[in-house]
């Protein structure tokens, strides 16, 4: 699998910064548009077939979110460090797994939000 970062909710300056970071590290960047949110995240990595119906494409993801797939440990460390240095981090980050590759963007967002709330003790 090609090292890829999926970007949800990125535009403007943040998207430009993310593009720069990914280009420097030879990581493919794929911006996911709101119209594509209902697709399983695995679709964008070539692992899961597209869906015809399902969740509404207008379900919002109110924060920036990234999904990382196919990165080596070194690439992952370099990416996270570069994003921190550039102050362009996403509120929510996930690594693609066999468990979440079939989830839509909004479903992944809900799960990551729950995990963050549990870790924050909310």
Regions found by a protein language model. Name each.
Residues 37-67:
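Short, intrinsically disordered low-complexity segments
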Residues 11, 35-37, 72, 98-102:
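Short beta-alpha junction loops
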Residues 14-23, 30, 76, 80-122:
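Helix-rich interaction surfaces within compact, conserved domain-sized segments
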Residues 1-47:
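N-terminal, charge-rich interaction modules
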Residues 8, 65, 69-70, 94-98:
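Short, charged/polar micro-motifs that form catalytic or ligand-binding hotspots
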Residues 28-35, 57-60, 91:
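Generic detector of short, locally flexible boundary/turn motifs and exposed helical patches
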Residues 2, 63, 90-91:
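A general structural motif
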Residues 55-86:
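Mid-chain, well-packed structural core segment of small domains
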């Amino acid at each position: 699998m090609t090292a890829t970062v999926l970007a949800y909710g990125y535009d403007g300056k943040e998207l430009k910064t993310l593009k720069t970071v990914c280009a420097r590290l030879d990581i493919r960047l794929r911006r996911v548009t709101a119209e594509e949110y209902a697709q399983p995240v695995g679709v964008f990595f070539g692992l899961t077939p597209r869906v015809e119906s399902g969740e509404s494409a207008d379900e919002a993801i109110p924060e920036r979110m990234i999904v990382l797939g196919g990165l080596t440990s070194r690439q992952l460390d370099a990416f996270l460090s570069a994003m921190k240095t550039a102050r362009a981090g996403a509120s929510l980050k996930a690594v693609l797994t066999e468990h979440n590759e079939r989830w839509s963007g909004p479903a992944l967002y809900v799960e990551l939000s729950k995990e963050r709330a549990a870790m924050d003790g909310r």
